[in-house]
Amino acid sequence: MKIPEEEFLAPGHRGCAGCGATVGVRLALKVLGKNTVAVSSTGCLEVITTPYPETAWEIPWIHVAFENAAAVASGVERALRARGRGEVNVVAFAGDGGTADIGLQSLSGAMERGHNIIYICYDNEAYMNTGIQRSASTPYGASTTTSPHGKESFGEDRPKKNMPLIMAAHGVPYVATASISYPEDFMEKVRKARDIEGPAYIHLHQPCTTGWGFDPSKTVELGRLAVETGSWILYEIEDGDFRVTYRPVQRKPVEEYLNAQKRFRHLTEEQKAKIQEYVDSVCQELRI
């Protein structure tokens, strides 16, 4: 795939060095192009790209509350359709907190109503903007400020909420997982989401140097390691048909992924083995 050179998210924003969210937005907008309206919930992306009166967005962009990105996007889509502008792409960007927790109700409603929108969850696996608090998307064992490791807790003790399958259960015509570290896979999924009639949901895994604890130069490497260990699986569900879009030639031990991040360094060998066992069971089910 030839990646277009034109940018719709300008440089000079205030993202952390190594920020994965901005990489994802840049790639998505290269596919969607100028004829696009973006909606962003409160979160990292909004804070770093639009400190008043500045903006990094080169397309129409709307900032909304933490919980209603999908609701506003659905309203924008209906308004454009009423004005005879149904060809305009409407995309919502929200973090895992604004998707799996606070915004789940409005997202569910928008998907169920069948609005022709694309919803992209940029998942850094915690509320990074407000201080690295755990979310429903925080993986088992990770240490956050609200699920810390210590005498009374070893870190997050709940499994990661499976948002893609929840969206698939709504009958959404196109659901996919993606990673910023596999740009061609992600961009092809954005293209499919754009071209399909009806709602589309993409769950984008994006390493966070600040919240995960790794060198900013390792963002892409960490994203690849998540996929190569089976900790994050790339797939799509198109009209109910499930398909894995990338299979590692030989899966690496999950320990390589865990050891590369500060948020997992407290885990014992026994706890790491438990996580490996879980990953193995999921991968075996999907024949990865």
From Swiss-Prot:
It comes from the Archaea. Keywords: 4Fe-4S, Iron, Iron-sulfur, Metal-binding, Oxidoreductase. Residues 137-148 have a biased composition (Polar residues). Binds 1 [4Fe-4S] cluster per subunit. Residues 137-159 are annotated as: Disordered. InterPro entries: PorB-like (IPR051479), THDP-binding (IPR029061), TPP_enzyme_TPP-bd (IPR011766). The keyword Transit peptide does not apply. Its EC number is 1.2.7.1. The keyword Iron applies. Residues 149-159 have a biased composition (Basic and acidic residues). Optimum pH is 10.0. It catalyses: 2 oxidized [2Fe-2S]-[ferredoxin] + pyruvate + CoA = 2 reduced [2Fe-2S]-[ferredoxin] + acetyl-CoA + CO2 + H(+). GO terms for molecular function: 4 iron, 4 sulfur cluster binding; metal ion binding; pyruvate synthase activity; thiamine pyrophosphate binding. Optimum temperature is 80 degrees Celsius. It is an enzyme of class 1 (oxidoreductase). Pfam families: TPP_enzyme_C. [4Fe-4S] cluster binds at C16, C19, C44, C208. CDD domains: TPP_PFOR_porB_like (cd03376). NCBIfam families: PRK11865.1. Heterotetramer of one alpha, one beta, one delta and one gamma chain. This is Pyruvate synthase subunit PorB. It comes from Methanothermobacter marburgensis (strain ATCC BAA-927 / DSM 2133 / JCM 14651 / NBRC 100331 / OCM 82 / Marburg) (Methanobacterium thermoautotrophicum). The gene is porB.
